[in-house]
Amino acid sequence: MFGKGGMGNLMKQAQQMQERMQKLQEEIANMEVTGESGAGLVKVTVTGSHSVRRVNIDESLMEDDKEMLEDLIAAAFNDAARRIEETQKEKMASITGGMQLPPGMKMPF
């Protein structure tokens, strides 16, 4: 079924992929992404592990109503979370050759 050394090579490749994915997961957890809302009036910077690092609110919004400001903060956070997910998918695709793993599934299987 596998050529001479084929199974060993396959296992070695799987181990290398696992190591690259682990390194990538650490890299993603440490990266920072900034989400924006209100045309950049509210910015939320989060890590790849979804920890909020900074919230930036333009002073012009301090005079506006509280509910609108809360909505803008939530929208900026959601934008940052979406950007993290996109970055994770792009980086994982570069390692897995485009092979999509089910959500939450990590190497090794």
UniProtKB/Swiss-Prot annotation:
UniProt xrefs under HAMAP family: DNA_YbaB_EbfC
Family: Belongs to the YbaB/EbfC family.
Region (Disordered): 1-22
Main subcellular localisation: cytoplasm
Subunit-structure text: Homodimer.
Highest taxon, organism lineage: Bacteria
Keywords attached to this entry: Cytoplasm, DNA-binding
Coiled-coil positions: none
Protein's UniProt name: Nucleoid-associated protein VC_1055
Species assigned in the record: Vibrio cholerae serotype O1 (strain ATCC 39315 / El Tor Inaba N16961)
Keyword Lipid metabolism part of the UniProt annotation: no
Entry's localization field: Cytoplasm, Nucleoid
InterPro entries noted in UniProt: YbaB-like_sf, YbaB/EbfC
Pfam families: YbaB_DNA_bd
GO MF, any single term: DNA binding
Function: Binds to DNA and alters its conformation. May be involved in regulation of gene expression, nucleoid organization and DNA protection.
One GO term describing the cellular component: bacterial nucleoid
